[in-house]
Each structure stands twice: as C-alpha cells, then as structure tokens.
Amino acid sequence: MFYEIMHRESCVAQLSTTGECRVCLEDFMPYDLVLVESDDFDERINNVTNFYYWCASRMLTLDRTYAKEILNSIGASQSVTDRERAQIALSYHCLSLLDVFWVKEENEKIRFEDINLFAHSLSNALVDIALRGHQMTVTNAHLLANDLSTGGLYPKAWVRKEDGFYLYKDGGREAVEREVLASKICRCFDCHQVLYEQGMFENEPVSISKIMTSQRYSLVTYAAYDVYCTNHDWNTLDKILELDAPSYYMMNILDYLVGNTDRHWENWGLLVDNETNQPIRLHDLMDFNRAFQQYDTPEGANCLTVGKRHLSQKDAAVEAVRNIGLNQVRQVEQTVFSEHPAWKATFEERLRVLRNAM
C-alpha cells in the first residue's frame, strides 16, 4: 500500500509500507520528515520508521495529563508504539491545526478543502476531554483527536468561535496566573507575541489565546527546523539569526525579564508561508505558564536557546540588548504585580540590569 503525503491539495511524496519512496515536491516536504529514494534495504526501513514517527508526532503525547482518558474516549489503546500512534493519526489523515500537511492512501478520493480543520467544525466534547479528563464518547474522533497535538504537559484544547480558534490551557490557577501576568509584561515590549487572557472553563481558570496558524501560515518548531538544517549541513541558530535576529533576541530578553525557564525546542520556531513552504520569521512568542521560576536572583536559569553555549538567562539577555536594544514601548503598570510584590522587585532589578548593559 502507498501513502501520499499532502501539502494542501498537492502530493509532495509517496511512500509504500515497505519503504519504497518517491519525493514529488522536495521544497514542500515537512521540515522534520526525511525520506530517501533508494533501493537499499536499510534506507527503506529508515523511510518507514521516519514516516511513522512523523505521523505519531501529529497525535497527542502519552505523557500529557489525562492522556489515558483521551485515548479511551477515542477508542484507542492506552499503551501504544509509534506505529500504533501513527495508525491512530492516519485514521484522521494526520490533520493538524498547526500546518497544512495531511496523509491519504493512494487513489483515495478526498480533498483537503473537504476535511481541513480550519474550515470544518469541531465538537465541543473535545474541550471536556482535554481539559477536565472526563470519560466521553466522541463519535467523530477522526476530526477530534488531532486537536490535542499542541505539545507540552498541560491540559489544553482548541475551541472554535465565530472569529476562529482559541487555545484554552489548564494546569491550575497558578500556571494560568503566571502566563497571563507574563503576557501583560511582554505587551510593553515590541515583539511578535501571543496575547494571553484569563478565562474560565467549568468554574476553573484557563488562559485563552487566539490561534496563530491558518490555511496561509504554518508553525514549524525549532526541533523540526533543526532536523531540516542538520540534513542540509547547516547550523540551525545561524540560519535563525539570518532569518529573524530581532525576534530571537527579544525572546531571550523577555524570557529573562519574566523568568520563563521552559523555552524548550518545541515551543519556539518558525512561521512558514504555505504558498512557498518557506519561513518568513520566527513565530509569535508563546507559552509562559512556567514564568517567574528561579526568580529570586538576577542570573536566572540556564538559557536553553543558545545552542551548545552555556549561558545564563541574564547573559543571553545582555547579549541580546547589546545587539538590538531593549525595545520597550511603554512602562509596565505596577498594579500587575499587586499579588506578587517579590516578583515586582525581581522584575525591576532585571530590567535595570538590561538598561545598564546597553
């Protein structure tokens, strides 16, 4: 059997279950999927392994809170391998709200415009499953399961409203407060960023943000881009600085100022133009529910975005302001720290460090 890997309505590659492969549109391949046209047995095995791993990555991760309940609700196994998870993702064509790739079987009569999640409604039942861990029966699981593939450990779900999709993130009152407070601070600086607001779901606090992807723009994680660069013998950070140094440096500045210690390689990356499958800049800065950690000293934690170098968050932020300045557009209102006076003192101290470094 052959699978066709699709980018919107175009077939970019064909792959058999034995690893035979034909790449049709190399420039439109997923960044983190490597397929090689070869008769070599080992390379064909690698093709199959890479394909199933890529498909599995488009489904919820098993270490997600409530993951077992979610899997039960869509009738899936609780203990699954990459291949089994891939089969679950393939059952709904590996659809995603993060990009426009999908998969179909050869000669299957189906179009992206008929099934893509940007244009077709989702059941509100998904929100219950993802956020509260309820046992529910989801009849249209082929459209629902993928909407949990947002990465990370915190319960989250996409909710469709009249003006588009919104991400609701749970994780407890403290995580929500941290994310919303960090967002209020970041808005005082010139940076592409996701705006987080506080809301309620079933009498529990959630942070709410609008989707940044669409049928025109996709998100590619740093992890995926690193796979792509490695296979081209490029230095990933060099390519990112070449593409969008200001956004990279602002990320390091703001993560330092708000004490975000969780900037791992799945929650930052590129915004890609789907017309060309080429990156246009870093995607909007997001994910602050681990802000105000290791926030009792000016140094901060180790910076996770500087490649193999060993820098503290302070050192990375100082390097950043010396390259692009602080780019503060308005003062941070003191009232935002009303419930956290110790955080206010640390923020002001870190802000002074960066101003003095310019």
What are the roles of these predicted feature ranges?
Residues T261:
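Glycine-rich phosphate-binding P-loop
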Residues M1-I253, L257-V258, L271-M358:
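Phosphate/dinucleotide-binding and metal-coordinating scaffold of catalytic cores
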Residues H264, G269-V272:
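Conserved protein-kinase catalytic-loop segment immediately C-terminal to the catalytic Asp
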